[in-house]
UniProtKB/Swiss-Prot annotation:
A zinc finger (RING-type) spans 280-321. It comes from Bos taurus (Bovine). Residues 1-38 form the signal peptide. Residues 345-431 are annotated as: Disordered. Auto-ubiquitinated. Controls the development of T-cell clonal anergy by ubiquitination. Pfam families: PA, zf-RING_2. It catalyses: S-ubiquitinyl-[E2 ubiquitin-conjugating enzyme]-L-cysteine + [acceptor protein]-L-lysine = [E2 ubiquitin-conjugating enzyme]-L-cysteine + N(6)-ubiquitinyl-[acceptor protein]-L-lysine. PANTHER family: E3 UBIQUITIN-PROTEIN LIGASE ATL42, RING FINGER PROTEIN 128. The chain crosses the membrane at residues 211-231. This is E3 ubiquitin-protein ligase RNF128.
Amino acid sequence: MGQLPGAGVFCRGGCGFSRLLAWCFLLVLSPQTPGSRGAEAVWTAYLNVSWRVPHTGVNRTVWELSEEGVYGQDSPLEPVAGVLVPPDGPGALNACNPHTNFTVPTVPGDWGSSVQVSWLALIQRGGGCTFADKIHLAYERGASGAVIFNFPGTRNEVIPMSHPGAGDIVAIMIGNLKGTKILQSIQRGIQVTMVIEVGKKHGPWVNHYSIFFVSVSFFIITAATVGYFIFYSARRLRNARAQSRKQRQLKADAKKAIGRLQLRTQKQGDKEIGPDGDSCAVCIELYKPNDLVRILTCNHVFHKTCVDPWLLEHRTCPMCKCDILKALGIEVDVEDGSVSLQVPVSNETSSNASPHEEDNRSETASSGYASVQGADEPPLEEHAHSANENLQLVNHEANSMAVDVVPHVDNPTFEEDESPDQETTVREIKS
């Protein structure tokens, strides 16, 4: 088949993958004439066989309307006809000996001469030589074509022969049963004539084992791929649902915690409105009278409209990251179960508390938040009195230390401004 116009120019010009793929499809799907061969095309052959008994004038013609043979991969796709002639000798059916001869019938010619009729070599497959050797020998002996029948035991199975270098004459393969029947007729002295015509074109030639293997492999790969995607999708869906449930639960807990936080309306004279007053860390605006503010457990103050949406999503202070759920002792449900975080909201501190504990910030924030909640009442004297009562003596062999413990504060400077009467005193007594 000739090259499609412009195909070479496109490929030499660095064509894109999509354009090259389109050209390849055109090359594969383009129609082919019977005189040309596709790389994977298989052409069948229609056979018209006639039997003629010598000296009796009786002709027996059998029309074969089915696909009886297969053209070789290197054979010309042309019709051909002739008398079938097997190799001479009982052991020469394979035609592997280069000296093999064929006894070709003749017909009377002009001036009393005899002329060989057009004939086709009938050769059996096998014998230790290739298809090309058999076909080339038949061509050298003057045959118009070669008819090769399959091994014994293969019934009427045929394959597309590969015979490079031996494409001078038509070569087809027929089944063993068909070839044996013709051979037996010839051996009984019956002249057999065969007319070969081009049949139908078929796709790539594959045997039953290849089809079975490809089908099973495709099924396994498809099943594995579908199973993986089902498992992956189910896992993602389960994780998404669990995450959604967790987020909804956390938002519900955050709403509960926000409802327990203190609200206060700013009035003229509050320290947040004074000359040294701070601004809201969320909107960066100064506090004004009648502003509604939210006081968190860590004593940080924000506009209610600014901090409430933040707390719903993050549940922590925008400045110090103090967890309001832990500080208020609200139970937090997680995926594996329910964990209750109970944090005492009081001014008392255990004498053996480690400064490296993870919940120290929450306890500190809770203590400070309790002091802010009672800012409008007179609890400062009670705090100072309680702090003086929390004097403990800790003995460590040769050294002893007495510590005055006051309520924990998250921001000492802020607490000193709010309650200047409180002091933190640490006395170390060495014995």
